[in-house]
Amino acid sequence: MKFSPAHYLLPLLPALVLSTRQDYEELEKQLKEVFKERSTILRQLTKTSRELDGIKVSLQSLKNDEHSAKIDVQKLLELGQKQREEMKSLQEALQNQLKETSEKAEKHQATINFLKTEVERKSKMIRDLQNENKSLKNKLLSGNKLCGIHAEESKKIQAQLKELRYGKKDLLFKAQQLTDLEQKLAVAKNELEKAALDRESQMKAMKETVQLCLTSVFRDQPPPALSLITSNPTQMLLPPRNSASKLPDAAAKSKPQQSASGNNESSQVESTKEGSPSTTACDSQDEGRTCSIKHKESPPSNATAETKPIPQKLQMPPCSECEVKKAPEKPLTSFEGMAAREEKIL
């Protein structure tokens, strides 16, 4: 019997089957793995295709972007050129400005130096002015003190001027009184002259009456009385002569007494007026009283003159009161001029 190779292979079949089964299982596993890998690859491919699509889109966008970028680059280049040109112009302008600023800075530096010198000079001037102000303040203080002293002096001077004004008024009033007195004295002088003429006629009449009385007495007396009279004829005859001689002496004495009394009265009036200026500033009523007093004082002098007959003519002495009263008129005018000047100064 002939054995074929297949008979030889039959016992090996189970092993082959097992091996094949194992191989199939392994293959199935491998196939599964391959399918898995294929699915993963497909998935990856889809992803990659998608990514490729995105890349294509991005490439197109990039192309578009590149084109726009090129346009932008060109624009930027143009702008860069323009900016370069502008920068050049700006640089030139800046250089010019720098030159100008440098020149200005030099000028400012010069002005600053000049101002510094002026500030130093002015500071010195300010110091000098401060020192002058201090000296002026001291002078002002001294001047204020002097002003106070001058103010006090001016007050005193004003008080003196007021007193002088009142004194001027008193002096004017005294001058008026003196003029009135001069007029009154002139009137009294005229009256005295008239009275002297009347007294001469009265004295003549008195002499005649005395002689008549004596003759009548001597005629009416008895003879024994005549013996007595004849024993002392000088005593009987002397009285008329003595009386006649005494009468001129008494009249002469009465005249200087009257003039002296008038001078004393005028001096007393003036002294009272000068000693008490308040009393001299009287009213017109006081003037009337003084006039009435003087008129009352004058008649007794006339009466005494009439009681004492004067055979000779009465020679009136020069009016000393008039001379005394006329003399103060000149100082009055000078005093009025001084008062007017003081009023102008005020």
Curated annotation (Swiss-Prot):
Residues linked to a glycan: 133, 264, 302
Positions with biased composition (Polar residues): 262-283
Protein name: Leucine zipper protein 2
Organism of this sequence: Pongo abelii (Sumatran orangutan)
Biased composition (Low complexity): 250-261
Any GO CC annotation of this UniProt entry: extracellular region
Biased composition (Basic and acidic residues): 286-298
PANTHER family assigned to the protein according to its UniProt record, in alphabetical order: LEUCINE ZIPPER PROTEIN 2 (PTHR22414:SF0)
Organism domain of life: Eukaryota
Signal peptide span: 1-19
Major place of residence: secreted
Residues covered by region (Disordered): 225-346
Subcellular location: Secreted
UniProt keyword list: Coiled coil, Glycoprotein, Secreted, Signal
Annotated coiled-coil segments of the chain: 16-211
Region (Leucine-zipper): 164-192
